[in-house]
């Protein structure tokens, strides 16, 4: 059998007898032959364009971390023909819809997307899926949208973990305050991550009957009106759970008012959060590794599109617990 015949069978082109196809496929199966994707892409000078659709990171420290991870992946995979275009929206739904319409009109091989506004994100993804290209979500998972990959934290389990951290060492009845701090344009009733974290938090106490009695109070505070916090809210409170990265707002109030003996659990390694963690005001921060999410999101598209590999559509990041004694070591470990 000639080399040309084998080449036509492997690349599925030209006319070849069924007998020769069976012979070549048997040898491929026996020896585990794999097509050299790199060589093929180089030979045809193939390019892969990915779109990244994220909130603007100016004034939003959290969103710089996934961008750092994306940039690292972009540099690493650029020699294999991968290029990335960025699309940013301001932190309001009008800006989001405007940029979403722009992204929908353009053609890419893959999309990395962080859903922030629930209804708008569902509508955008439902429309974008019609393009039939790979999509990866980071930070938040919209379970209503099927066949879309997600790389990020299991929000329900992270809330469950927060409940466990708050309950440690408590021997008698305790009072817990859940402070829900949002921007004016956010709605906790429609924010999937928020809901899942709070649901997981309550589930821990419900499922563990051996715990002492805990009493729960919820308050809603707008980020733009930080003076809504009052000392009265914290009377008799033993612990505070803030289900997002704005835990530093509560920590600042507690420190300035010299409120003692209140355990605080929140999320994310923002500088202000780390400062209060180091001061001993915040007890625990749950880290969702946003830089790794960004890197792994692009890596997912690279493996699926460039390497033609089968990849998992659901990858949960480990739940890392940061305390005063270990956060500096965590900061030293980079991608």
Regions found by a protein language model. Name each.
Residues 29-61:
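N-terminal helix-turn-helix/winged-helix DNA-binding helices
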Residues 27, 31, 188-189, 205, ...:
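Hinge/cleft segment of the Venus flytrap/periplasmic-binding protein
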Residues 71-82:
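Signal peptide-proximal N-terminal region
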Residues 150-176, 225-226, 289-306:
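Hydrophobic alpha-helical segments within soluble ligand-binding/sensing domains
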Residues 120-157, 270-278:
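Flexible loop/hinge segments that line or gate small-molecule binding clefts
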Residues 110-129, 215-271:
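Hydrophobic alpha-helical
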Residues 1-41:
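N-terminal helix-turn-helix DNA-binding module of bacterial transcription factors
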Residues 55-64, 85-96, 152-158, 180-200, ...:
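Hinge/beta->alpha junction and helix N-cap segments in small-molecule ligand-binding domains
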